[in-house]
């Protein structure tokens, strides 16, 4: 055979070589084109050897690999090689297709082995020949591909020619094919590296010697192209299986899943390479642009199109560059471009001319003078530009336009190329239009292709919209509209034939006569199937009153299919508009497809006026679907709709033709030469191969189906995702190392970005998709290593896809990552020799990384770099992964091991939204004990306070002389301060560095609220870093730590109490010198902010202004110095030996730390038990007692409820001092808490014989009764009582006759006191005034 002779002329092979691996590669290497330029026909055609007479491809020296897949007969490619085997002829056609897939895979794996063993390993074994960077650039992750395909071949061999089993092999390894994306991405680097090597004499000699020694007829460059060619053919080979597979048999869905998977891979590689080339071109444009004053062009997104047009009323042509965000207008001057203007896409308006099919106008809709009337060179060029301008107008519009509405608008355009739209239906359309229709056609048809059969899964549209429709697996969803199509079929056919020969085609692929002969048969089969389906359709239509598909349904199915069954939201409102759209679009597509059937018109015939009218009959209804665009927005959003826009081109691949076009089109598949040429490469009928490559949208839509069915990501969103990925990548190296330091063995400490590979499998059944996602989640929850590469779309998460997530040096495809849940095949799938080869390569790269840390980064970038805008699936994946600006791991319920501060907390400085100024990123509730545990601690402390007390000093000397007079501190506040003190002890911090207790109490009260909310799964607001540091304290020994800190805090306050106290006016029996009287300030000027705490509720409290407070402190210091009794005063609170030492913290510093007017929420207020006080009274000298206790009393005392045992009990040897202290302190407590009532005569006498005179009585809101009494040797004294709780007094002189009062609980009063005596009128009047003031303040508070 001719091919066999050509392949074996060097005698180097004893087997026939696949055409894809030889001639096509040879041609491509001879032409020095990119890998994506000249992929040739299907592998199986290698055996055909001769060009098929019905091959309709661009003339090429390698196009002898004709479309054998499309034929049954003597020209079948299987006859060439397999014809020598009689058993091979006995196989059915389907069996021969399966056998051919396996055999070509075997040849391909042998070629890969030759690259790895005969070239790569020899270079590694030759020291000094090439640097590791050159080796990495030259071979990429070829070893990973070899590992993957070796395992795949082993699986295929075990299938025993079972087509379902063969298809399942591809489905099971769907994720692993991402390594091909990396290889193709690196291929330009490989070509450049090989070119550089051939310029070096020594290296060139090495490669020539190797080729001669191996007796290869092809150079290394041809072998390096094979992976690119092979991966682009898998979906076509699998389509041939589906084409001849009975859809009623079990396993048909598996075949379709495999087609979906490999089509996604092919499309993704195609789009990735196109974007990569555009990114390179963008940098080139940036360097050549003159007079541009704006930012770097990369900030405007991806370069979409570029072309030079003739502009009306402008002498010289203008070169236009269309980016994702702006339209740049320049004038070419030599090799440079002179900036002439630009229009933001958000302000861009498109006006299509109906008179001239080549003209259209772009203008700034706010500045009509900035207008450019452009004349394209061809109709196809105009279609391309107008389509992309429309798309960018919608995507950049200020108003929020529903995605489905955008898609519906765009799908009305005749130019809807697959390389820019990755709708799943677009991909399926490529499979649905086949020139040859088998007898086993599917029940469902594309609405846009009534005469074709559909070879895509019936359930895919349902999954794409987020729900599975159980009753529609056998039929397409577009069936309800088929009856409409029949009415248009004949007219559409006539229109299509009329324009079949229109001129102006960019790529005119003629229809061979042999292919035309096959069409009548195909049409007859389709019509027979149509008759059968119409019966089912009529039954279904009777159950439906209207079409259930809406614009949302249109988006997923070429904008034309209706979705019977459950309606998507909003579908009823737009029912009529959608129906009219469906009819118009259906008729248009039907005309185009029927025209191609009848006369195979040229690829880019211009649309007819009828088509224009049909496509725009229902345009006016579209704005109703929009979400209220702003004024001018409607014009902007839909300006692009004015002009001819026949519905999208039906590029339906005929398998052999599509394969050849796909692999031979010089600028169509991967666009290496010219970005503009890549974009302009459009063929309504001839580029059938491009449709199969448009399936990435299906991946992302299915991945987002659970949240937003059929959500398509515009480039603007994709660009944002790429920014996120870049930021994530930049911070992840630090994060991963810190995560290791934290010792996170489970959870998301080292999250891996999920690659686009999972999008490959997302095309499968929804139940399979869910299973895949669960496996992905498992792999994420147990990441084996912290290595992350932001690859093609994201980093691959799969195991054997080796170089996807691991350093390519690790033998990427090397199945050594056995701990990955997505790794379906283990290392055992490879032979021992293969494992040794891969291990050697892996060790080589690891050794290079060890010597040069930058090598690892550069290698990964070369394999995983994707231009901005290509991160397709990343947006939906980021929603389920930790954000770079939050704590990297900490899942809910997960607690960090150990009590030390994890190093990963340093990541709090990452940028991100802050809900509270100065606060870090939110912290999960896992870092704190539940609020219930904290509450239990306080309850235990409170219960200990309620227990019987052994000494009054122990329970009563707990907070009446605290120097902080600006707020009432309750138990929960004290506990909060205690937690804070665990981080920074107030005794060791300077006044300026530590916040006031009030501030800490406020922060930690907020923490309690946040903890209570976080128990339910969500943290309300981020916390202060110092509060975050309390997490490890709360994790262990919470009770002990809290109690110890409470004691420490009490000592701290005791220290301040003894050094800073406010002066209190002496009572009448106290010996006050005239000097002391002068120093006692009047409290009449003290501001009253609010009433005192009452009934366990938060009440506003009396406060001192900062100025008065400082004055009182100064006066108190002066008084204490002149008083002889001061020497013994500090020891009455002997909490600890250190309590005697003076504190350096000034009251001014404490007061300035918090505004005195800041109220606090308080909890229950525990009143002391007066019975204990009474039992402690003993007889002693009153005068000495007063002198020893009162001179340093607080001027303003407030009641505080503190846990019991917070202070040390007083020494037993100082009983009378404690008794006197408690008496006086309780007096201060009562005076501070409540105002006096009218005076009452004495009712009881204590142990010491001292008479107590009731001076006031008040019942609180909680039914507690407060009695204020005077005690002293002068019961006849009628001097008015003056309180020291901040209430007004006429002068300090009036205080001299006051008796000492104290407070009694409601339980004690009835037992201890009888009826009260009446007081004199004057005194009652004064007391009544004070009481009224107090009650008024209580009501206000």
Curated annotation (Swiss-Prot):
Composition bias, Basic and acidic residues: 817-832, 939-948, 1309-1320
Lineage: Eukaryota, Metazoa, Chordata, Craniata, Vertebrata
Gene: Plekhg3
Pfam families (UniProt xref): RhoGEF, SOS1_NGEF_PH
GO molecular function: actin binding; guanyl-nucleotide exchange factor activity
Localization terms from the record: Cytoplasm, Cytoskeleton
Compositional bias annotation for Low complexity: 18-29
Full protein name: Pleckstrin homology domain-containing family G member 3
CDD domains for this protein: PH_PLEKHG1_G2_G3, RhoGEF
Biased composition (Polar residues): 42-51, 59-68, 798-810, 949-958, 1135-1162
Record-listed Phosphoserine modification sites: 76, 433, 502, 571, 694-695, 737, 759, 762, 766, 862, 899-900, 947, 1129, 1134, 1136, 1141, 1155, 1158, 1201
The organism of origin for this protein: Mus musculus
A biological process term (GO) from this entry: regulation of cell migration
